[in-house]
Amino acid sequence: MSAIHLPDTQNSADTRQIIIDKVGIKDITHPITYIDCDGNKIPTIGIFTMTVSLSERVKGTHMSRFIEILNEGPCEFSAHNFDKIIDKVRKRLESDIAHITLNFTFFRRKKAPSSGVESMMDYQVTLYGTLNKDEVQVMMKVVVPVTSLCPCSKSISKYGAHNQRSHITIKAKAAKDKTLHIEDLIDLAERKASCELYAILKRDDEKVVTERAYDNPAFVEDLVRDIAVDLNADDKISYYRLESENFESIHNHSAYALIENQKC
């Protein structure tokens, strides 16, 4: 039986002569494994946006090739290897520039501060990668939920102080020849907060975290400034964008602060 010839419309010439900056697939869900700083393999679900630049001479890109790359696997990522899949996309799609954004939930086992009960804490992570010919740029973003306690409320109240959950978001780029781990950013944010969060707390743990937060009050301004001090001093980091959003327990709005620094 002879093969049927099917026209390759997307690979035909385009006469409008306009370059497309980004074209590809957005928000495709795929299972992945993330390898943490200790080498532990953490299975999770990734949401990918994968794009390339498109020449002014070509009508369309090869959409199916993006998904083929994911299906070929292995979809194992770490702080060391995210650039490999970006390079694979650029070469397979025959493009000068490739972009990948990967969102996933990162899980970390934590022990409660008094009882020692272990539970899994979740953090939202985004990896950003761009490869322009042979120049690669990779950044990571992590959202760290913490507790913040108001210094003003503590200073004026007899019986306690209002506190709330806050999200500290750190987007950072590693300096040349340096490795930056997700855990580095999580540890920093939790260390500077009034108190960190846990999935499970027994009564003695709840006493510890309540008192710890009371002993470490912080405005939203304090949170970003304290974290920025360490980010500025960290030679592993060449750029960062730092945000804190406090979901105020006594208001129907959030308090917010941002610091951004292109160090080098």
UniProtKB/Swiss-Prot annotation:
- State a single Gene Ontology molecular function: GTP cyclohydrolase I activity
GO biological processes: tetrahydrofolate biosynthetic process
The EC number(s) given in the record are: 3.5.4.16
What reaction does this enzyme carry out catalytically?
Answer: GTP + H2O = 7,8-dihydroneopterin 3'-triphosphate + formate + H(+)
Record-marked site positions (May be catalytically important): C150
Q: In which pathway does it act?
A: Cofactor biosynthesis; 7,8-dihydroneopterin triphosphate biosynthesis; 7,8-dihydroneopterin triphosphate from GTP: step 1/1
> Which keywords annotate this record?
Hydrolase
A Pfam family assignment: GCHY-1
Enzyme kind, highest EC tier? hydrolase
User: HAMAP family attached here?
Assistant: GTP_cyclohydrol_B
Q: Which family does it belong to?
A: Belongs to the GTP cyclohydrolase IV family.
What this protein is reported to do is described as: Converts GTP to 7,8-dihydroneopterin triphosphate.
Q: What is this protein called?
A: GTP cyclohydrolase FolE2
